[in-house]
Amino acid sequence: MPADHIPALALAGPTASGKTAAAFAIADALAPRLPVEIISVDSALVYRGMDIGTAKPTPAEQARVPHHLIDIRDPLQAYSAAEFVQDATRLIGEIRARGALPLLVGGTMLYFKALFDGIDDMPPADAAVRARLEAQAAAIGWSGMHAELARVDPPTAARLAPGDSQRIQRALEVWHVSGRPLSSFHTTKTVAASDRPMSAASLFSLEPHDRAWLHGRIAERFHAMLAAGFLDEVLRLRARGDLHAELPSMRCVGYRQAWESLDGLYPMSSLPERGIAATRQLAKRQITWLRSMPQRHSIACDAPDATAQLVQAVRARVWGGSA
């Protein structure tokens, strides 16, 4: 049975840090006494048909240890941090009721932040408003949309780059739906600390001491994805006819760069370089977020015994001296 003092554990890290393999190592180490079920904390893995570019666990891997929040949305749909918190909270309760330990694994730091800190009481996504904003962006560009955001919500515009289309769109959507700037929602949370499903004290992280090590793995993985048919995967998604470049699913790292190349905005020969560069930038943001969480238990993922260190730390957290 899971320890009462630990409702769940979390494993975070930048892309290509080895989270999937580490999660299986944790599950194997605890299995003799405590079964584990994995809750994905990844905004790309929620989408069906996006397998290669997301490094989605294979069906065999998902059968080996139960996985949740994978393949739960069509790429045409959105999936918000608020929906994630609702789903993850429900799953944590259900998994514990089965006598297992929930292990939340991923790199979408916005989801972890919402889970640990509570979520701002913002309005839900509005498809009609988003469609109008996308049409406006097609006419004036995202730099023009950024200027519009600066008019209605200067603090949010100041922290967003003019090319950050996804966040600019969301900020303008909040303004149009609620009549309030996004920045005004950042002072209150809807969930009290005592009611949150878990805290950052149960967060383990994989972080490289040598950034070059991670950069090498990112490059190796992107080239492997291309060799595995990633571009064909994007072509199949485009062939549906109902997807476009501004959807959250198609803004995922790798997919966005592939879509741009297929649109002729960049030479196809530049796709590996641009995809790797975008993935490195994502990893940099992920590491920055992790380092802002002083309660985390950090493991150097580039250490030769990283997996052994992680398993030992997890066992100590779960069972203390009885590990």
UniProtKB/Swiss-Prot annotation:
Coiled coil: none annotated. One of its GO terms (biological process) is tRNA modification. The keyword DNA-binding does not apply. InterPro entries: Dimethylallyltransferase, IPT, P-loop_NTPase. It comes from the Bacteria. Its EC number is 2.5.1.75. Catalyzes the transfer of a dimethylallyl group onto the adenine at position 37 in tRNAs that read codons beginning with uridine, leading to the formation of N6-(dimethylallyl)adenosine (i(6)A). HAMAP family: IPP_trans (MF_00185). This is tRNA dimethylallyltransferase. It comes from Acidovorax sp. (strain JS42). The gene is miaA.
